[in-house]
Structures are given as C-alpha cells and as structure tokens.
C-alpha cells in the first residue's frame, strides 16, 4: 500500500470587489516579490535548502508574499506555509497562453497538486497576455472548496487591477483614482541597480491612501545568471535580460535589499531629529497585519564615532544601551515610544534603535546622529589633542603664475587664471587632488581682479571671488597644515557679469563642486556618514549612520558576477561627516563642516550588457561634494516617478544667505 503525508493548514481567504483581500477576516496588503526558481549550478533545478534560504531572505526584507510565472517547487510552498508567506500560484504562460487541449490538463494538475497549501491565496492564469480565457472557469472547478480568486497579471480583470509597472500618477479612473481593488503584480523593476527599493516609498505611500489597495510584487528576487559549462564556467545573465534581482545569483545582497527592508518594516518611525530638547520619546506606527506592538520589543544603543584626528576611543564603541518601551497599539495605529536618556547620552555620536518581532528576530534598525555635522566637527575638534605643532606660521603669496598657501608640512598651489588647485605637496610628496573646484549643476566664473590673498593669525588665506552661482570660495591653510574651504553659493538673484539668473540648471540633478583624483591611487575608503551602501536620491533608506570601511572594488551591479563585491565602492554616499581616501602613497581625509553633503567617489561603470544607460549622469570629476544628487529608475522616465525622484529646482530671493559648502582637508602625511 502506498501512502503520502501532506501537511495542511486552516485559514480563510476571501476576495471582495471594491474592498480587498481578506485573510482570516483581516484585510491583507501584500508586500511581495516575484521569484523565479533559480540556482547558479542547477538552473531551474533547486533544492529544499535553497527554498528555505530564499524564503528566509524574503522574510528578512519584511515581505509577506511571493509570485512566480509557474508553479514553484513544492518545497518552496512548504516553506511559505511554514513561515507565513502568502503565494500567488500561476499557470505558466509568459505572454503566450496554452491552447484549449493542453491548458486544461495543466490547470488540473497544478491545482490538484497545490490545492492544500494554505499559503496560496490567489490563482493566476498566465502572464502579460499569456492566458486562454477558456481556462478561466477551470480554476473554480478544481478549487471547488476554497474558490480562491483568479487574476490575469497585468490586466484589469475580474475586479482586480494588476497593471504592471505603473507610473506614480497611474491612472485615469484606476489605481488611486479608481474604484477597483488594485495590486500591481510587477513593479519597481530591479534591473542592475535600478528599481527595487529606489522610489518604493513614494509609490507605496500614494497607493496606501486608497482603501482598495491590496499590495504589489516587486520584480524580481534574484539575478539569474547560470554557470555556463559551454563558456568556460562564466555566469551568464544573457546581457540585460536577467540581472533583475534585489539579490545576486548567489543571493548577494544589493543596496535595494536593505532599502526594501527599511521601507517595508512593519514598525515605522516618524521623522526624528535629535536636538537639545530630545527627551527619549518618538512616534512609531504599527504596520503589521495582526500583531500588537506590545508583542514586539526595541532596544537602543549609544555609539561613539571618533575622527581620524583622535584615536583615543575606538569608533563604534557602545557607551550605553537599554530597552525602549513600545506603545500597546494595534495595526494601523501610531503611538509614542520612549526610553530614559542615559547620563552619557550627550557623550555619544549616534543613536541606534533596533526592533525585534514577537519571535525575537530583528526586523529593522535605524540610526540618528546626536550631533549634526557642524556640531560634530566643532565638538571633536575641541577634544582633539594639539598634535603636529607648527614651527613656522603658514604664509600666502601670489605671483603672476601661482597663488601659494604654504605651511611646514603642506603647500597648496592655485592657478591664478582659474582659481583651481593645481598642485598639493605634503611632506615632499605630491597629492594628486587638483583641477577644482569645478561647478556642478551651476555656472560660476572666476574673477581674478576681485580675488586676493592675505596672512592672518588663523593662517594663510586665499579668497577666490566669482560671478554667477558662487559668491566666493575662501581657502585657509592653518599653521598645522589643515586646509579649510568655505564656499558661499546661490546667495544672489543676479549672478552679474552677464549671467543674470541663468547660472544654474533649470532641473538640478547634481549640485556642488568637483575635483580630480586618479582612481588608481585609491585602495579603499573609511568614512563616517550613511553607509555602507551607496545611495541615490530616491534610495537613501536602508543606509545607517556610523563609521564604515570598504576596500576599492569595481563592481558593476548585476554584472560583475565573477567578482561580485558588495557594497559597491563607487558612487554617491549620503550625509558625509568625514571620509579618508586610503592610498599606499597619498591618503588624505576630508571633513564636512555643514550638513547634508553627498560624497561622490568616482563614477561607476555602466554594464556592458545594457540596452541603454542604466544610471543618471555623474559629475565630470572624480571626487565631488554635492548638495543634491539624482534619482535612479527603470522602465519609466524620472518625470513619471514619485516626488522624491524628481530633480530639484532653485529659487533665490534678495536677502537669502545662500548655500554653504564648508570642508576641511587633512593632506598631512
């Protein structure tokens, strides 16, 4: 006698037109991802261990749903049943439907195999036109007891609009402007470094304004690049056809992995700024489906982040920690969390909060600077021992061919015709940081007749004056060899000298100053700011404040499969406090003295297999200090994305103090 054991579960699943999907009587919003069955070595052949790994990664991203283009391995459905992940089970049909001879057999086999999996909440007939209408009645026929809802993915069909890759304002009489339940079964296409978590919150927040929003599925879980034995064992994603994942082919975590995890965390924190008035309380929102927040817990840690000028205490050291009292609030409610500020709170540099679910698993962590960049700089400089005392005061000299600021250890030379750095010598070694400042996203013209040098008690000074977007850039070299830069930008409505008001881009993607520095000289970077992943304007969530380090790499997201090192080295880094560019010959450190600076470190290479460029344009220089950066997107252009993806615009009124870009450079060897 043959027998088979099958584990089943009991739950109710209901669909109500113009209302939503209800699981056990509670309205469900799916936070989902599309997943292909894939392994590097086995292609479409996977294992129970891989299914477990993938399901756990889905849960770690705070997702609760999965869809694919065909019935998955049963062991993956078993994992979904076990972990509480809901599933949209689809009859294969990628844009071409089965005929009426083969199709009925496949519908019957799929439903009879999968019917007892409680994770399955919706059936799907084909994909993007790949359905046969004659098969539709068969889903209810074979799912005779539960009669789960059936959809045509990408279509507005059967009272559920599943439109693929909607724009932010989709659409006329549909989605947020319509009167049908909507659930995009593909959106935020994560090709290369695009999509995924970039811009996710804009779309999600907009859709959540409509009670008929039932969730959606990001495309796609992992890059599909099988090992090609016929091509020497390379991993091949077929150029741009399959590098679509938020994780790599071996499940390497990309930046979007963490961005999604943060934006879909079931516990959300309202915007928080640590000031002198902070008393340890802040607002939290419960975005769980069922769980009251009193079943969860949260901890806090106070960390120190020292500068390279002071090594008295290891960066990242925890000087205080404890528990946060969470409010007893039901799903959908907002309440106040609180903790008692430890006596050492103001001695720290970063507040870290971490939330744990009812099973004790970490669901998200958030970080907040206890001091903003200028406060941090002043505080740390006041505590820094007075090392490397100067023998002679710094001097400023000007000739017809050069402007020179010179101290005992560092000499900085400027071109008097352009106002740009032409040479830096430190300890007898040339530091190849030069050819700047060059304006990014704006126009400025150096005015040599208005510029001047002077010697002061605070060091050697060179004041470079400009027409256009910049008013002045003051360089000051201290006796100890520290180089200060104070730039005043956009403080006048008319740039003068023929510029009038046409001295900035009408759409601001990048705005700031850039310099050149040879990439070959750089071996790594250590910095304080958001990290460890690079950011885009619409993908800052998922990065945290701290001191980070990464060695140089040339990873091309979704393509460098033979040497896939994450986080990527090149790109934009948010909220820089300080950064050390490591080099065997010419390391140096930059300190930010104002807030919100994006640090552009070299320009990532475009994927060779791309159909078109995948990233917005970077500044022309190698190293940039920016007050605004561009967003990234896929499929739809930027103007069809959400508000946090849009380029900035500049308005200047008489009396504005302008924008400041204040830095300090330590070139001392």
Which residues fall in each region the model found?
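N-terminal carbohydrate-binding accessory modules
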Residues: 1-58, 78
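Terminal connector regions
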Residues: 2-4, 315, 342-382
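Extracellular interdomain linker/stem segments of modular secreted and single-pass surface proteins
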Residues: 10-17, 372-376, 520
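Substrate-binding/catalytic cleft of secreted carbohydrate-active enzymes
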Residues: 49-259
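Substrate-binding clefts and catalytic carboxylate motifs of secreted carbohydrate-active enzymes
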Residues: 123, 173-339, 345, 588-624
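Extracellular/periplasmic ectodomains of large secreted or surface enzymes and adhesion receptors
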Residues: 237-238, 244, 250-251, 255-259, ...
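Exposed beta-strand and adjacent loop surfaces of beta-rich binding modules
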Residues: 279, 295-299, 350, 421, ...
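Beta-strand/loop-rich accessory regions of lumenal/periplasmic or secreted enzymes
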Residues: 344-346, 375-669
């Amino acid at each position: 006698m043959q027998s088979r054991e099958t584990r089943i579960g009991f739950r109710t699943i209901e669909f109500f037109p113009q209302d939503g999907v209800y699981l056990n009587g509670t309205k469900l919003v799916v936070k989902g991802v599309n997943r292909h069955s894939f392994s590097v070595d086995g292609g479409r052949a996977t294992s129970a261990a891989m299914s477990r790994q993938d399901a756990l990664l889905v849960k770690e991203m705070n997702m609760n749903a999965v869809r694919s283009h065909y019935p998955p391995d049963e062991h993956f459905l078993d994992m979904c049943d076990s972990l509480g992940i809901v599933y949209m089970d689809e009859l294969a049909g990628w844009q071409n439907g089965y005929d009426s001879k083969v199709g009925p057999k496949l519908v019957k086999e799929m439903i009879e195999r999968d019917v007892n999996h409680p994770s399955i909440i919706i059936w799907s007939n084909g994909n993007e036109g790949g359905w046969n209408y004659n098969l539709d009645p068969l889903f209810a026929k074979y799912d005779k007891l539960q009669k789960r809802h059936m959809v045509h993915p990408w279509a507005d069909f059967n009272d559920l609009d599943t439109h693929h890759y909607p724009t932010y304002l989709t659409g006329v009489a549909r989605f947020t402007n319509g009167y049908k339940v909507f659930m995009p079964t593909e959106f935020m296409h994560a090709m290369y470094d695009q999509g995924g978590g970039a811009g996710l919150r804009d779309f999600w927040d907009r859709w959540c304004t409509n009670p008929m929003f039932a969730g959606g599925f990001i495309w796609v879980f992992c890059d599909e690049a099988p090992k090609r034995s016929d091509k020497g064992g390379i991993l091949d994603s077929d150029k741009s056809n399959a590098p679509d994942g938020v994780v790599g082919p071996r499940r390497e975590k990309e930046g979007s992995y963490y961005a999604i995890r943060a934006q879909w965390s079931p516990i959300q924190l309202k915007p928080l700024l640590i000031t002198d008035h902070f008393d340890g309380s802040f607002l939290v929102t419960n975005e769980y489906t069922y769980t009251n927040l009193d079943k969860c817990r949260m901890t806090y840690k106070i960390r120190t982040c020292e500068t390279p000028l002071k090594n008295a205490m290891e960066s990242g050291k925890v000087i205080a920690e404890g528990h946060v009292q969470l409010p007893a609030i039901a799903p959908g409610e907002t309440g106040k969390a609180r903790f008692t500020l430890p006596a050492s709170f103001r001695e720290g540099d970063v507040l870290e909060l971490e939330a744990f679910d009812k099973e004790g698993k970490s669901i998200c962590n958030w970080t907040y600077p206890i001091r903003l960049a200028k406060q941090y700089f002043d505080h740390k400089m006041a505590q820094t021992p007075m090392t490397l005392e100067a023998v002679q005061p710094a001097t400023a000299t000007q000739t017809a061919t050069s402007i020179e600021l010179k101290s005992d250890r560092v000499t900085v030379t400027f071109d008097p015709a352009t106002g740009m750095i032409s040479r830096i010598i430190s300890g007898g070694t040339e530091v190849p940081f030069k050819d700047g400042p060059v304006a990014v996203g704006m126009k400025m013209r150096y005015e040599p007749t208005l510029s001047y040098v002077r010697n002061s008690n605070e060091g050697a000074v060179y004041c470079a004056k400009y027409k256009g977007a910049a008013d002045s850039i003051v360089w000051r070299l201290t006796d100890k060899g520290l180089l200060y830069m104070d730039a005043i930008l956009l403080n006048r409505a008319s740039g003068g000298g023929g510029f009038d008001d046409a001295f900035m881009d009408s759409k601001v993607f990048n705005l700031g100053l850039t310099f050149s520095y040879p990439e070959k000289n750089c071996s790594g970077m250590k910095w304080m700011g958001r990290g460890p992943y690079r950011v885009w304007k619409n993908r800052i969530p998922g990065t945290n404040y701290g001191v980070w380090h990464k060695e140089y790499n040339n990873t091309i997201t979704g393509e460098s499969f033979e040497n896939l090192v994450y986080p990527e080295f090149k790109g934009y880094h948010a909220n820089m406090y300080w950064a050390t560019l490591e080099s065997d010959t010419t390391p140096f450190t930059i300190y930010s003295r104002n807030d919100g600076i994006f640090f552009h470190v070299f320009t990532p290479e475009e994927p060779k297999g791309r159909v078109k460029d995948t990233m917005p344009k970077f500044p022309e220089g190698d190293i940039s200090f920016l007050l605004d950066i561009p967003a990234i997107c896929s499929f739809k252009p930027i103007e069809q994305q959400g508000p946090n993806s849009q380029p900035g615009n500049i308005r200047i009124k008489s009396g504005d103090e302008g924008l400041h870009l204040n830095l300090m450079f330590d070139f001392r060897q």
